[in-house]
Every structure is written in C-alpha cells, then in structure tokens.
Regions:
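Flexible, glycine- and charge-enriched loops at secondary-structure boundaries
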Residues: 4, 94, 181
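Hydrophobic transmembrane alpha-helix bundles
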Residues: 27-28, 32-33, 40, 94-103, ...
Length: 199
C-alpha cells in the first residue's frame, strides 16, 4: 500500500509538472508597471535563470534595453536596466548583490560563447536609500565585453523595494559604462521613478 501511495504521488507530480505552462515573455502580463520607452527593447524570462542557475530565486526578469545598447559607437552602449520580480521577502546586502551579479555575468559571457578565464569582478556598497526604496546600492561590474571583445567596467545602481502585501520583492538594476553624471542615467532613473507596484 505504501509503494502504491508513493507511485501515485510520483505520477501526480509528473502530470502536474507536464501540464505547467511554459513561460512566454512576449505574452506574460506583468502585475506591476515598468515603463517601456519608445524604441527601447523589452525582454522577459523566468528566474531561475538558464545561464545563471546558481542564483537562488524564483520569479521573472524584465529587461529594458536602450536603442543603442548593442552599438559600440553609441553613448547608450551597454546601457540598460532590468527588474527582478521575485517570490517572497528576499533578503539582500552588498555581498549578496556582488555574488549574484558575478554569477549572472559569468553565465551571460559563457552563454555567448566566450572563454570566462578572465574573472568577473563586482564591487558594491550600500548607500543612502532613494525615496521608496528599502535599500539602495551602487557599484561596478568589470567583465569581458562579448560584443566589443575587450574588458569593460559597467556602473550599476541597485534599488530594492517590497510592496504593501510583502509577498514579492523587486530588485531593479540600472547599468551603463558611462559615469553617473552622464545624461543616460536620467533615462534609466526615470524607469524606476515611474515604477508602480500595481498597474
């Protein structure tokens, strides 16, 4: 009887897993508002992330690419932002951010067919929190740029927010190799300023 019960539970798991709908980033309806400026690219995929499965979260990554993010001659090169919409109350600090982004960009470089013998170096610190943030961080990511085939240092701002129901955590990353005084940061900042927990 015990064996039969185990077989039944196993079969139920297999059936429910097989019936789980595959995530479709193009049709997925976000329950929050994150602006999509004209001519900016949008991409969404599930977390855990295929190329960085070591990052221990469950949710969705929602990306906004500037029009020139993949053009080496553009002031917008490597300038983009992404939101992690995560299950639960996720704890984070500067060290966790460093580790997560190190795994993330190591995996991204590998996924683009580049040898990752050159380490990804991430350095972050907590700073005075922005309005409505639970925590705010800034730092840098030094890595091999798989598009330009050379080392690049990307500046990064990180915002953490937990909305009223406290069942989701939002971690928003703004990224650009341009200094924080450059005008591109106004566009990236605006994405977070205009963010709303609900549509």
């Amino acid at each position: 009887m015990k064996i039969l019960a185990i077989l039944f539970l196993s079969l139920s798991f297999v059936i429910s897993y097989a019936q789980a709908p595959e995530f479709n980033g193009r049709t997925w309806e976000a329950p929050y508002h994150l602006s999509s400026p004209a001519n900016w690219g949008v991409e969404r995929f599930p977390i855990p992330i295929d190329f960085a499965p070591q990052i221990p979260y469950k949710g969705v990554e929602d990306i906004r690419f500037t029009p020139g993010w993949a053009k080496a001659a553009s002031d917008e090169f490597w300038s983009y932002a992404f939101l992690w919409y995560l299950e639960g109350d996720v704890k984070t600090d500067a060290k966790i951010i460093e580790n997560n982004l190190q795994q993330y960009y190591h995996g991204l470089i590998t996924a683009n067919g580049i040898d990752t013998s050159n380490a990804v170096i991430t350095t972050f610190k907590e700073i005075a929190k922005d309005t409505h943030d639970v925590k705010t961080f800034n730092g840098t990511i030094q890595m091999f740029d798989y598009m330009a085939k050379q080392t690049i240092v990307i500046n990064c701002k990180v915002h953490v927010k937990i909305c009223k129901n406290k069942t989701k955590t939002f971690i928003f990353y703004e990224l650009s190799p341009k200094p924080l005084s450059h005008i591109i940061w106004q566009s990236l900042d605006a994405l977070w300023t205009e963010f709303k927990c609900k549509k």
